[in-house]
């Protein structure tokens, strides 16, 4: 069999996605199952063990009734527009941008200052000027610089 005989692949665009249950994922590519020839989305979790996964591309892209609402299983997000308001999102964004840069031959930690460290001194009382506000502001600037480097490497 040659490539002309294969069914269409219907690729999932690479990028940053959020699952309807809240987890962040990075789509790396669309691959083909050697047994069924079905298009499979190759993605990695941006939390926990950071494992690689495959799922049928049609299932990855489906809209269904999940948790009582009709919604997409996975929703794409522009890394430049992701709100920085919680640690899981911040960690996912950093991992996604590092991976994206690495695939373009850039070591972000060598090319830029490293992303800001997570605060360790928050009292949890919601203070004005909380250390988390400073963290998310610094991360916003790191994100801008990282995206600028990645986009420049794509040109």
Task: Describe every region a protein language model picked out.
Residues 119-134:
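Local cysteine-cluster metal-coordination motifs and their immediate loop/turn environment
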Residues 23, 39, 93, 123, ...:
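Amphipathic alpha-helical interface surfaces
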Residues 80-119, 138-155:
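Intrinsic-disorder signal
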Residues 39-48, 110, 115-121:
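A short, structured beta-strand/loop element
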Residues 55, 69, 92, 134-137:
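Generic alpha-helix structural propensity
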Residues 2-81, 96-103, 147, 151, ...:
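Mixed-charge, low-complexity intrinsically disordered regions
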Residues 63, 130, 138:
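Residues that scaffold the ATP/ADP-binding catalytic core of kinase and kinase-like folds
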């Amino acid at each position: 069999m040659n490539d002309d005989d294969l069914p269409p692949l219907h690729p999932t665009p690479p990028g940053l996605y959020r699952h309807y249950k809240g987890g962040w994922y990075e789509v790396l590519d669309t691959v083909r199952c050697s047994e069924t020839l079905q298009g499979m989305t190759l993605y990695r979790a941006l939390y926990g063990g950071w494992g690689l996964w495959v799922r049928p591309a049609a299932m990855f892209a489906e809209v269904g009734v999940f948790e009582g609402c009709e919604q997409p299983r996975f929703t794409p997000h522009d890394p430049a527009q992701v709100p920085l308001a919680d640690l899981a999102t911040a960690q996912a964004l950093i991992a996604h941008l590092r991976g994206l840069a690495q695939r373009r031959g850039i070591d972000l930690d060598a090319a830029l200052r490293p992303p800001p460290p997570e605060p360790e001194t928050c009292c949890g009382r919601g203070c004005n000027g909380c250390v988390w506000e400073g963290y998310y502001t610094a991360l916003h600037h790191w994100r801008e610089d990282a995206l600028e480097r990645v986009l420049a490497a794509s040109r």
